[in-house]
Amino acid sequence: MKGDKKVIQHLNKILGNELIAINQYFLHSRMWNDWGLKRLGAHEYHESIDEMKHADKLIERILFLEGLPNLQDLGKLLIGENTQEMLQCDLNLELKATKDLREAIVHCEQVHDYVSRDLLKDILESEEEHIDYLETQLGLIQKVGLENYLQSHMHEDD
């Protein structure tokens, strides 16, 4: 089914954000695990997998619309050097992604592509949940201090 060119452009832009997130979150996960912060590492690993699932759905949709998924133009990863920076980098990426998602949703509405719109709304909901998690973690660091925060994230949840 031939899709709207601008919808395909939006889907590819969102796909690019997801590809950045997959790699960024995966690296952050491994860094936290290496530092002994197993709870943070496990959570970040699952976020990376969620982003991979989003990318998969976007690729399927782009192909269905007879577009070409762009997996080559990988943007810059935002890699922190410490836990607080890493959380902030993830938050910055998610805030950009949600802005792009909202713009894409508006366009899909305008051209009556409700299937793409619904896919993007599902991804937006997931990204908003991640933003809430990241804001909560950064808030906890402010409330309990970095050392207490880090100590509470040394062991994985059972």
From Swiss-Prot:
The reaction(s) catalysed by this protein are: 4 Fe(2+) + O2 + 4 H(+) = 4 Fe(3+) + 2 H2O; Fe(2+)(in) = Fe(2+)(out)
Q: Which family does it belong to?
A: Belongs to the bacterioferritin family.
Q: What else is known?
A: The unstable catalytic diiron-binding site within each subunit (Fe1 and Fe2, ferroxidase center) also serves as a pore for iron uptake; the ferroxidase center is labile. In the iron-loaded BRF crystal structure additional stably-bound iron ions are seen inside close to the ferroxidase pore. Mutagenesis of residues reveals other stably bound Fe cations in the interior of the BFR shell; they may represent a pathway followed by Fe(3+) to the central iron storage core.
Q: Where does Fe(2+) Fe2 bind?
A: 51, 94, 127, 130
Q: Carries keyword Transport? A: yes
Cellular location(s): Cytoplasm
Under which main EC class is this enzyme filed? Answer: oxidoreductase
What does the entry list as the binding residues for K(+)?
A: 148, 151
Its keywords, alphabetically, are: Cytoplasm, Heme, Ion transport, Iron, Iron storage, Iron transport, Metal-binding, Oxidoreductase, Potassium, Transport
> Which Gene Ontology molecular-function terms are recorded?
ferric iron binding; ferroxidase activity; heme binding; iron ion binding; iron ion sequestering activity
The UniProt Biotechnology section states that this protein is used in the following way, namely: Small molecules designed to bind BfrB at the Bfd binding site (derivatives of 4-aminoisoindoline-1,3-dione) cause cell death in model biofilms, and are bacteriostatic in planktonic cells, suggesting these compounds are potential antibiotics. Model biofilms were tested in strains PAO1, PA_1081725 and PA_1076058.
NCBIfam families noted in UniProt:
bfr (TIGR00754)
Any idea what this protein is called?
A: Bacterioferritin BfrB
Q: Which cofactor does it need?
A: heme b
Give the function comment from the record: The major iron-storage protein, part of the heterooligomeric bacterioferritin (BFR) complex. The ferroxidase center binds Fe(2+), oxidizes it using dioxygen to Fe(3+), and participates in the subsequent Fe(3+) oxide mineral core formation within the central cavity of the BFR protein shell. Can store up to 600 iron atoms per bacterioferritin protein molecule.
Positions of heme b binding:
52
Q: What is its EC number?
A: 1.16.3.1
Domain of life, per UniProt, equals Bacteria
Per the record, what is the consequence of mutating residue 85 to A? Assembles into normal BFR with wild-type ability to oxidize Fe(2+) and store Fe(3+), 5.5-fold decrease in rate of iron release from BRF, greatly reduced affinity for Bfd
Q: Name one GO cellular component term.
A: cytosol
Q: Name one Pfam family in it.
A: Ferritin
Task: Give the Ferritin-like diiron domain ranges.
Answer: 1-145
* Induction conditions: 24-fold increase in transcription in response to iron treatment.
Kindly state what the record says about how the cofactor is bound.
Each BfrB homodimer binds 1 heme group coordinated by an axial ligand from each subunit.
* Database matches in PANTHER family: BACTERIOFERRITIN
Q: What effect on the protein does mutating residue 68 to A have, as reported in its record?
A: Assembles into normal BFR with wild-type ability to oxidize Fe(2+) and store Fe(3+), 5.2-fold decrease in rate of iron release from BRF, greatly reduced affinity for Bfd
